[in-house]
Amino acid sequence: TSGVNMADNIMVGSLGENALSAVALANQFINIYQFSCMGLGQGASIMTSRFWGMKNEKALKQTIAITTRICLVLGILFTVITWCFPEIIMKIFISEPAVISQGVSYLKVLSVSCILMGLSLAYSNVYRSVGNAKWPLFSSIGAFFLNIGCNYIFIFGKFGAPELGVTGAALGTLIARIFEFVFICMYLIFFDKKIGFRIHDIFMKCQNLMKEYVQISIPVVISD
């Protein structure tokens, strides 16, 4: 997942220092959200691995439901902030107008991917906790190479596509995040039989596990 952002940084380097600085600084803000969701997912994986070993299917689903709700709320919050205040975000890191302008364009497009990325990160940790490390691996590899391909097309205007520069890098990342989300989340919710989590399980009563989840996850988020 981090490789997607890294690919953006590398591929916009040929556009000049302003473009490279804009993408690198914008990704610093996105990384705050990314590491938060990774921490939530890791906290969830501590609990899901235990419940998986205990064969406690209900508690396993409750933990995933809690993680889903928190990631959705956090994702919506970051989406709104990134979409509505990209210029303020960029000014936190730099005062150069040319860099800020390109960073705003990048963040505007990338804001749409926040919710998708958060859920993908969290569910990937859940998969690993129940012994399925291959699915997140395939998802990350696919998203990485899809992002490189889309970046090449949209940054440099190949195969008849418009030359979008920094905005093209953000568009490539958005497409990669959509792929990652469909690969990880849609499979878990609609096709997976190992965990058996479905959309209606998101609304399960989970008060009995909420305190434990917070106690485990918050320290992980802070340390990340």
Residue ranges and their predicted role:
Residues 48-115, 161-218:
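Short alpha-helical transmembrane segments in multi-pass integral membrane proteins
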Residues 2, 35, 75, 79, ...:
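Residue-level hotspots within the lipid-embedded alpha helices of multi-pass solute transporters
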Residues 71, 126-153, 167-174:
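Alpha-helical transmembrane segments of multi-pass membrane transporters/permeases
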